[in-house]
């Protein structure tokens, strides 16, 4: 290599500087020195390679890729496939990185490592799993722990996004990363309690490892723990403990972690908790899901879920056009997905356009028959909300894969019974029983449907139709006395002889008798307490003997208290129980008497005489026809007067209000 260079420094000396800076990790100075070498020889392959490495170490991936693409001819023999693919990977050009790796002349270990990362980002988990398995088996270096962590991450992704039951790879949970990935796999399988325990272990390991790492900054443990706490909050949310989950989510957001993917997921989960409540908070949180680079941090299903929730939030905030725009975009990306069309239908229903919503759902059902069941269930729900039960039943019966299910049969029979369409309800039973007869004969669901059909027919008086069902049940279990009794009851109306013949199969009274130890019953003390039931005494009941009746009354009767001014020598007033104005010696008020009697009749007339002259006080003749709700009665004669205790005297025409005033002035009758 020719000597010379900038400022009289020789090229070997420059290379020595590059080597020294590289060992110290000072790639900025190393890059400057490499550029000096390239000024001397611009086509130096080693210098170009070093420049690319320095740029990558400094995070200048775009510049590094430009250097590689600019000097393609020079670097043809010394291929930089790994460096090029790595730059494309870090620039989120994943498809280009895959092509670069696949076109490489030689598949080195570091290219395989990168290949696994690229496959993971492309969500090709089966291929990715095979690559990492091969690397774990055949690699022997200090990065074995990282490879196992990546392998467990692939298993967790399969469990969550593809619902694949993870196989036991025998990975020991020695680090918090491995524990975290194991917990994620358990969440995908629905084992939430076990996942929470593993996450708590991951938290302990994380705190321990970070406390031992003296080089780590104070933000590092918070960032690592935030991911674990976020997953804990997600488990709490799945368990229905939304208040605890919400509190933990908000604590993480207050820490302001730099991971935009974590913030986006937490914000999305808070929005799902808020639903149609606290929409102002949801509007603030949705901004976190729009941060730059989020699309490169999350999986496709996570991004899709965030978009769905954005559409729902737009619907809850009455942004109809925004809701339609987002849901239409989602439908164009995934035409077969149910949620976009369901969101559009929900928006139409909020606008009271139920007919359009049903038409939209019907169109989707025709285009995607594989997803028609869920759509038709929604259509039936809308029909029921409109009060069109019969149409809803027709829609439900058109779902071939569900119409024989016990739950569907129950719903249809209930709705047909509500519509008093018993024949259609029986037809639903018949079709379901026939399906089980052909596919799952004598299964528990089959026999249960037969019994329910028989009970339903008996309930609505279809005993003749219930006979075949009861016979089938009795043949399955001849010892079922209840079914036999129902069968005999049904035959008694149709074929009495057959009912009589079947009654012979009933057990005898001797076999039905209970095996009871009579002596033990006789020797027992009997009931220690019997609750008395009170009842009304009717006129037909036999009277008790006078002595017994008086004796019981004397026992229950308490001695009354006499008033303080009681005088035993004075005879009590026999009319003391009557109100003052109803007593025979009552003469009315003295003050203002003439004033009150103005217009009441001729002067000198008594109250009794005035009542006889008053036509309104005379007994009216019976009506020619009874009033609605009452019987026609003949008026009683004046000699048969009801006692004053139950009827006011004829000479008391005053109003109720005046009576109350007089009672207050006259006082109650006393001794």
UniProtKB/Swiss-Prot annotation:
Residues 532-671 are annotated as: Disordered. Changing residue 579 to A: Strongly reduced RNA binding. Keywords: Acetylation, Cytoplasm, Disease variant, Endoplasmic reticulum, Isopeptide bond, Phosphoprotein, Repeat, Ribonucleoprotein, Signal recognition particle, TPR repeat, Ubl conjugation. There is a cross-link at residue 391 (Glycyl lysine isopeptide (Lys-Gly) (interchain with G-Cter in SUMO2)). It holds the Pfam family TPR_8. The modification Phosphoserine is found at residues 630, 635. The modification Phosphothreonine is found at residues 571, 618. InterPro entries: Signal_recog_part_SRP72_RNA-bd, SRP72, SRP72_TPR-like, TPR-like_helical_dom_sf, TPR_rpt. The keyword Membrane does not apply. The modification N-acetylalanine is found at residue 2. There is a cross-link at residue 391 (Glycyl lysine isopeptide (Lys-Gly) (interchain with G-Cter in SUMO1)). Heterodimer with SRP68. SRP68-SRP72 heterodimer formation is stabilized by the presence of 7SL RNA. Component of a signal recognition particle (SRP) complex that consists of a 7SL RNA molecule of 300 nucleotides and six protein subunits: SRP72, SRP68, SRP54, SRP19, SRP14 and SRP9. Within the SRP complex, interacts (via N-terminus) with SRP68 (via C-terminus). This is Signal recognition particle subunit SRP72. It comes from Homo sapiens (Human). The gene is SRP72.
């Amino acid at each position: 290599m020719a000597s010379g260079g900038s400022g009289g420094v020789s090229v070997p000396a420059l290379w020595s500087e590059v080597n020294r800076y590289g060992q110290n990790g000072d790639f900025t100075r190393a890059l400057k020195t490499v550029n000096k070498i390239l000024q001397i020889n611009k086509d130096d392959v080693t210098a170009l390679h070093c420049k690319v490495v320095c740029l990558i170490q400094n995070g200048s991936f775009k510049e590094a890729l430009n250097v590689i693409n600019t000097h393609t001819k020079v670097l043809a023999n010394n291929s930089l496939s790994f460096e090029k693919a790595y730059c494309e990977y870090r620039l989120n050009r994943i498809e280009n990185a895959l092509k670069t790796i696949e076109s490489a002349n030689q598949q080195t270990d570091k290219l395989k490592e990168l290949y696994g990362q690229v496959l993971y980002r492309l969500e090709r988990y089966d291929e990715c799993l095979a690559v990492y398995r091969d690397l774990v088996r055949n690699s022997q270096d200090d990065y074995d722990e990282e490879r196992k962590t990546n392998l467990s991450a692939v298993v967790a992704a399969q469990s969550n996004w593809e619902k694949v039951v993870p196989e036991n790879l025998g990975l020991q949970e020695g680090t918090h990363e491995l524990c975290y990935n194991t917990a994620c796999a358990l969440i995908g399988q629905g084992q939430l309690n076990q996942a929470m325990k593993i996450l708590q272990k991951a938290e302990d390991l994380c705190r321990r490892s970070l406390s031992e790492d003296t080089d780590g900054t104070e933000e590092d443990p918070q960032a690592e723990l935030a991911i674990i706490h976020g997953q804990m909050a997600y488990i709490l949310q799945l368990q229905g403990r939304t208040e605890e989950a919400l509190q933990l989510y908000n604590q993480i957001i207050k820490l302001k972690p730099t991971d935009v993917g974590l913030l986006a997921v937490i914000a999305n989960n808070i929005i799902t908790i808020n639903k149609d409540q606290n929409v102002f908070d949801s509007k603030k949180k949705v901004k976190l899901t729009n941060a730059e680079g989020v699309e490169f941090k999350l999986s496709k299903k996570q991004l899709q879920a965030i978009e769905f929730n954005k559409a729902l939030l737009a619907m809850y905030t009455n942004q109809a056009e925004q809701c339609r725009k987002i849901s239409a975009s989602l439908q164009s990306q995934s035409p077969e997905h149910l949620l976009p069309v369901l969101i559009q239908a929900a928006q139409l229903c909020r606008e009271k356009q139920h007919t359009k919503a049903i038409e939209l759902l019907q169109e989707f059902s025709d285009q995607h028959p594989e997803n028609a069941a869920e759509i038709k269930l929604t259509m039936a729900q809308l029909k029921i909300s409109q009060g069109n039960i019969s149409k809803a039943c027709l829609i439900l019966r058109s779902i071939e894969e569900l119409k024989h299910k016990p739950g569907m049969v129950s719903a249809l029979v209930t709705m047909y019974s509500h519509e008093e369409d018993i024949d259609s309800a029986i037809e639903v039973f018949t079709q379901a029983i026939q399906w089980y007869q052909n596919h799952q004969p004598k299964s528990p669901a089959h026999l249960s449907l037969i019994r329910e059909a028989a009970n339903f027919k008996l309930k609505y008086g279809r005993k003749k139709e219930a006979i075949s069902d009861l016979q089938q049940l009795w043949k399955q279990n001849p010892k079922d006395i209840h079914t036999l009794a129902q069968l005999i009851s049904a035959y008694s109306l149709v074929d009495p002889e057959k009912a009589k013949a079947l009654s012979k199969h009933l057990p005898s009274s001797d076999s039905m008798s209970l095996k009871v130890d009579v002596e033990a019953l006789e020797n027992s003390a009997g009931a220690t307490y019997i609750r008395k039931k009170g009842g009304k005494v009717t006129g037909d009941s036999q009277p008790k003997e006078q002595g017994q009746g008086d004796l019981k009354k004397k026992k229950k009767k308490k001695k009354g208290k006499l008033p303080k001014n009681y005088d035993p020598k004075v005879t009590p007033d026999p009319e003391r129980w009557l109100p003052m104005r109803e007593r025979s010696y009552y003469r009315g008020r003295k003050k203002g008497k003439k004033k009150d009697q103005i217009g009441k009749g001729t002067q000198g007339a008594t109250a009794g005489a005035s009542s006889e002259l008053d036509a309104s006080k005379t007994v009216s003749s019976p009506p020619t026809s009874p009033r609605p709700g009452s019987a026609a009665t003949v008026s009683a004669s004046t000699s048969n007067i009801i006692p004053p205790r139950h009827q006011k005297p004829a000479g008391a025409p005053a109003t109720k209000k005046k009576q109350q005033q007089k009672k207050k002035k006259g006082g109650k009758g006393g001794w």
